[in-house]
Design a protein with these regions (language model features):
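Double-stranded DNA-binding cores of transcription factors and transposases
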Residues: 20
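Amide-forming acyltransferase catalytic core, primarily the GNAT-like/NAT-type
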Residues: 2-8, 23-26, 30-77, 83-94, ...
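Active-site-proximal structural scaffolding
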Residues: 48, 65, 96, 118, ...
Length: 365
């Protein structure tokens, strides 16, 4: 396999760091040390500090008996000085062989001024894992500049909305009434909510799974969504008779009794979204949703427009919030960075990486 990040090879300072640091994957018995680092140097009362269940769901690697974190442990003091957490789809289905890495927490202590310490963690994981794709969603300006320096493809994550235009008042969003009313597409498919058992019964030869990402699998969606410890996701099968053409994976979000539906992942050809316009509208009416939104990278804009999903940036003054824990009524513009050795087109959704992760405990929401 090609090296996904050859720019880090031959860096003398990385080799020299081994004299002072033990750089490796985080052991299970170092959980308390890592969580203390996150709480003290990354974010106070982070969800991983508050919930070991959530941390284990995302980072506990039972296959390798470790956590999916690389740490730099100072040999003299025994303290963690830097950490790099990552998410893989392989984590949710070990049968997935091409490995995609989603960088998550990447932090070096502010008081530690050691050249290349954080970069050395990147070097370690790419030397110890057969990485095909490194993709980061929702990254800081500092991280973005580093990824650009390394030759990553970068850009803005797109945010689309399908409005409920039958409401007189909106609370979660602003100026959604400025979206021009469009003629609805005919519903050529039937949208049916399905549970885990019904999902598992869908044949592997169905069209929906012929369009699945090489980094995901049928089992991945079970482990990632149906077995989530805190969030409740809903699956909608888009059916043509008995055949499943696509599946919408979504989660209800809200604030003070006002609600929306967020499509966090999608299996199949995105053009099929345009074949259930009326049923999506009926769903919004039934559930009192202000809108349905979709955050993505890589889908065809024309296909989403044809499905009557509108890019929020195309409507002046339109505000569609991205943060609900806690709720912030403002637009959020997120960057992405991607580096791959595969020729396959990559499409990402909100639930990729750790973007659709709780920030608060359930009783605080």
């Amino acid at each position: 396999m090609k090296d996904a990040l050859p720019e880090l090879n031959g860096k003398d300072y990385i080799e020299k760091l081994n004299d002072d640091y033990d750089i490796r994957f985080c052991r299970l018995d170092e959980f308390d040390e890592l969580i203390e680092f996150i709480d003290k140097y990354w974010r106070k009362n982070h969800i991983f500090v508050l919930s070991k269940e959530m941390f284990d769901f995302q980072h506990l690697n039972l296959e390798e008996n470790r956590y999916d974190f690389v740490i730099a442990k100072h040999r003299e003091s025994g303290e963690i000085h830097s950490c790099f957490g990552f998410v893989t789809t392989h984590h949710f289905d070990p049968e997935i062989k091409p490995i995609i890495i989603w960088p998550a927490i990447w932090k070096t202590r502010d008081d530690i001024k050691v050249k290349g310490l954080g970069v050395s963690l990147f070097y370690y994981f790419k030397e110890n894992l057969p990485v095909e794709n490194i993709s980061a969603l929702g990254i800081s300006p500092i991280a973005l500049s580093i990824y650009k320096h390394w030759g990553f493809e970068t850009g803005k994550i797109r945010h689309y909305v399908f409005p409920n235009q039958n409401l007189e008042e909106y609370y979660l969003c602003e100026n959604i009434d400025r979206i021009e009313k469009r003629a609805m597409n005919d519903d050529d498919l039937k949208m049916v909510e399905i549970n885990q058992e019904e999902y598992e019964a869908i044949g592997e030869d169905e069209e929906v799974f012929s369009n699945i990402s090489r980094y995901k699998s049928k089992k991945y969606y079970i482990s990632r969504f149906f077995k989530h410890p805190m969030y409740k996701y809903v699956f909608y099968a888009l059916k043509d008779g008995e055949h499943v053409r696509a599946i919408i994976i979504a989660r209800e979000c809200g604030y003070k009794g006002h609600k929306c539906l967020r499509i966090v992942d999608y299996i199949g050809d995105v053009r099929y979204l345009g074949s259930v316009n009326h049923q999506l509208t009926d769903l919004m009416e039934e559930k009192k949703y202000e809108y349905i939104d979709l955050v993505e990278v890589g889908s065809d804009d024309d296909d989403l427009h044809a499905a009557n999903f509108i890019d929020k940036d195309e409507v002046e003054g339109l505000v569609i919030p991205n943060y609900f824990e806690p709720f912030e009524k403002r637009n959020i513009y997120l960057d992405y960075a991607m580096r791959t050795v595969s020729d396959d087109k990559a499409i990402f959704f909100k639930a990729d990486s750790d973007q659709d992760r709780p920030n608060m405990l359930v009783n605080e929401m």
